[in-house]
């Protein structure tokens, strides 16, 4: 059995690019609304359930993410971004915008399977980082499995630097 490690990525807020919304009309990226709660959770949970790099931890991980998800949706301003295609939620990123937390990207950018490899994950990551940076965080952190698609293809973007990280499942904030 191969042990799978964790990586913690760090981005400097002052080095982030500016926001850009280069979308076709039928796509949008914005904060989630309360009526999108069910679709948003479906995108996040299926992203973890369908990716084999999470198999050994998903039964402990999803309840923790769900707890933070429910907490976020109980507030007036929801700390979750969604990507929509028409009225369908195709991507979501649950964040914790407090300045001094060990992990800001609770779910990381989660994209529905059929919409992957189109740049939505990178765009969702960038907008998540910018949203956290607006809350006075100088360094922004995101944790993921070392074998995840996020670690290989998404998180190195926008100046993300990785380091090995010891993940206790009580510390939640991961990346798909």
Segments from the language model and where they lie:
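Acyl-donor-binding surface of acyltransferase catalytic domains
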Residues: 1-25, 168-170
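A short beta-loop-alpha structural element at the N-terminal edge
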Residues: 28-42
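Conserved GNAT-fold acetyl-CoA-binding loop/helix
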Residues: 48-68
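Conserved beta-strand in the GNAT
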Residues: 80-82, 88-97, 103-105, 110
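Conserved GNAT acetyl-CoA-binding A-motif
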Residues: 132-144
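Conserved acetyl-CoA-binding loop-helix of GNAT-fold acetyltransferases
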Residues: 111, 117-130, 134, 153-157
């Amino acid at each position: 059995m191969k042990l799978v490690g964790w990586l913690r990525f760090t981005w400097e807020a002052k080095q982030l690019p500016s926001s850009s919304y280069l979308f076709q009309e039928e796509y949008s990226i914005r904060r989630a609304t309360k009526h999108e709660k069910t679709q948003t959770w479906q995108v996040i949970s299926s992203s973890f359930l369908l990716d084999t790099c999470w198999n050994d931890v998903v039964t402990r991980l999803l309840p923790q993410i769900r707890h933070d998800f429910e907490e976020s949706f109980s507030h007036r301003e929801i700390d979750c971004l969604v990507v929509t295609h028409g009225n369908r939620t195709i991507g979501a990123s649950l964040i914790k915008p407090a300045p001094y937390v060990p992990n800001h990207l609770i779910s990381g950018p989660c994209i529905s399977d059929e919409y992957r490899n189109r740049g939505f994950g990178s765009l969702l990551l960038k907008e998540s980082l910018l949203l956290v940076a607006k809350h006075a965080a100088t360094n922004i952190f995101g944790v993921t499995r070392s074998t995840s698609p996020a670690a290989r293809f998404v998180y190195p973007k926008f100046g993300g630097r990785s380091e090995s990280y010891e993940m206790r499942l009580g510390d939640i904030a991961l990346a798909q």
